[in-house]
């Protein structure tokens, strides 16, 4: 009687990403940089950090790492491509205030420390510290679901597909 086996609902494995920083989760549309706010690089979330530690939002591989330490890309084990960008226009700091703990092509585990950044250095230089996490290949997975605005802790689920 295998006839009805095909009627069983196939369980779809949820693909999730967790907050890379602790702070205040805000809608991506509210950030001051139009490239992010208009989702030109992908849909996602923004967090105003309360401390300067950035952690891996999922298990995966570092596929892009800017030498300045302000941005990196991770491809998760599930094939989700995440772009994490610390601050607005912080590339201009040329790495000042950033300490990177990983290299390109490193395999990382969810919760692993990736970058330390000095919030006071960023703010003192006049930069917004809001940290964006984007799903750059979201079209492959459908809708990007996001946690509601509010206080989040690094490691808390904030995006799922």
Predicted regions located by residue number:
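Contiguous, well-folded functional domains in the mature portion of proteins
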Residues: 1-161
């Amino acid at each position: 009687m295998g006839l009805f086996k095909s009627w069983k609902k196939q369980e779809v494995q949820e693909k999730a990403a967790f907050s890379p920083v602790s702070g205040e989760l805000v809608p991506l549309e509210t950030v001051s940089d139009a490239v992010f706010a208009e989702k030109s690089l992908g849909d996602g979330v923004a967090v105003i950090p309360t401390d300067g530690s950035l952690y891996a939002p999922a298990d995966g591989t570092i596929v892009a790492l800017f030498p300045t330490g302000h941005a990196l890309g991770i491809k998760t084990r599930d094939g989700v491509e995440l772009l994490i960008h610390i601050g607005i226009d912080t590339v201009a700091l040329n790495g000042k205030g950033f300490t990177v703990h990983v290299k390109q092509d490193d395999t990382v585990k969810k919760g692993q420390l990736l970058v330390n950044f000095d919030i006071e250095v960023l703010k003192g230089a006049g930069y917004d510290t809001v940290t964006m996490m984007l799903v750059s290949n979201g079209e492959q997975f459908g809708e990007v679901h996001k946690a509601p605005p509010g206080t989040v802790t690094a490691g808390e689920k904030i995006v799922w597909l």
